[in-house]
From Swiss-Prot:
ANK repeats lie at residues 49-78, 82-111, 115-144, 148-177. The keyword Repeat applies. It holds the Pfam family Ank_2. It comes from Thermoplasma acidophilum (strain ATCC 25905 / DSM 1728 / JCM 9062 / NBRC 15155 / AMRC-C165). The keyword Repeat applies. This is Putative ankyrin repeat protein Ta0196. Signal peptide: none annotated.
């Protein structure tokens, strides 16, 4: 399946005296007026990991700045050096309001990082049940697989995220999908000793 992904930023010469610490701290704690005055400098800067102002805003839950930067600059799906989008940073830091704001602004919800993990994959890995619920309700692909062939359901089995698995099952995920090690959800749960996952799977009427 082909994804419409944002550009991975290619660094160019910086024309400001800003550094990573100033860049991040300004977005993290700065007042809105100061940020508006520095808007162009902030947007044109990228940190060591090629993260832009929108990504840092999402990371620290600055929903007000997400809306500000997204309205000013049309790069909502740009990716950093590891392929993370602003939505990915919101998800990985469990910033619900940031994620909701980005989704409302029509960001792409299934852009994978450099390892093939999409936002819902990371939400499952960390066990962020509310985030998983949000992503499912927003149309995330629940059967997408990462570079190891792991679907969100297989990841839930590996990491013992039983509540996440229940949500995925309710949403109609494919329990028979296998990763590159020929593991489906049952085999993954067995391999990682996830008894709680096996109990969830045992409760299914169709069994293995």
């Amino acid at each position: 399946m082909q994804f419409s992904v944002g550009n991975i930023y290619q660094p160019s010469e910086c024309h400001t005296c800003m550094d990573d610490q100033t860049f991040i701290s300004t977005i993290k704690t700065g007042d809105k007026k100061k940020i508006e005055e520095m808007a162009d400098d902030l947007w044109n800067y990228r940190d060591l990991y090629q993260r832009n102002a929108l990504m840092i805003s999402a990371m620290y839950g600055r929903t007000d700045l997400i809306e500000f930067f997204a309205a000013r600059y049309d790069h909502i799906d740009d990716r950093d050096i590891e392929g993370n989008t602003a939505l990915m940073w919101a998800v990985r830091n469990n910033r619900m309001e940031s994620a909701k704001s980005l989704i409302a602004l029509k960001c792409s919800i299934d852009i994978p990082d450099s390892a093939g993990n999409t936002p819902i994959c990371w939400a499952v890995i960390f066990g962020y049940t509310d985030m998983v619920k949000l992503l499912i309700s927003s149309g995330a692909n629940i059967n997408i697989s990462n570079d190891e062939g792991d679907t969100p359901a297989i990841l839930a089995s590996k990491y013992g995220r039983s509540e996440c698995l229940k949500m995925l099952i309710e949403a109609g995920c494919d329990l028979n999908a296998k990763n590159h090690n020929a593991q489906n959800v049952w085999k993954a749960a067995e391999a990682f000793g996830r008894k709680e996952i096996l109990e969830v799977l045992a409760s299914l009427s169709n069994g293995r």
